[in-house]
Amino acid sequence: GERLSEADLDALVDMLASLHRAFVGFQDDGLFTNRAMRELNHQHIFRVPLDASNGLDLDALTPGLSGAATKLREDTDFVAAVETLGRVYLRDGGTLLHGDFFPGSWLRTAEGPRIIDPEFCFLGAPEFDVGVLVAHLLLADQPPAIVDRALTGYAERIGTRPDEASRALVMRFAGVEMMRRLIGVAQLPLTASLARKRTWLRQVREMVSSAARQTRSSGGGG
């Protein structure tokens, strides 16, 4: 994908961190619960991609992709880890999230990036927003240094120390977002071969399952 400049990345991370900081501990009166939207998105993010009867012909998109999807769907540990993440996503939190922080919600302007689509906002786990950002950096083949810059820059702007459990949760959410963009109905205009998509799906399995094991061993997670 097109390389994201460090300046644009920093601006995106700054906007996300500013949103999260501004509403830490916010006492919601129901305005930002956004339950109906969140439940709809939960289906599309965590359930539909793993449902073989979702009506999506993956082989029409990329011949052979349905077989790769079946292998992922038959991995019971992976499916269980995704279900656990889905429960974390639905759990009310104390941070206002954008809720759909991917390139389709970013506008490039002469004054720098701008963010749209606030209708997805809800109070939840901030790692979800960061995970979505990381997922799309990976799907755009951004270099590892850009991903590290995003994660480090976010932590610095939030003012938190490095937290292995939080980082693991970010990567788990990133893996699920990649999965739903590869084998779910919310497809991206990716010009990628079957081999490339298989590689991404192997990465997805590792990100979700290994990060889940890491979280359990450290005593964190949902």
Protein language model features and the residues they cover:
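ATP-binding pocket architecture of kinase catalytic cores
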Residues: 1-32
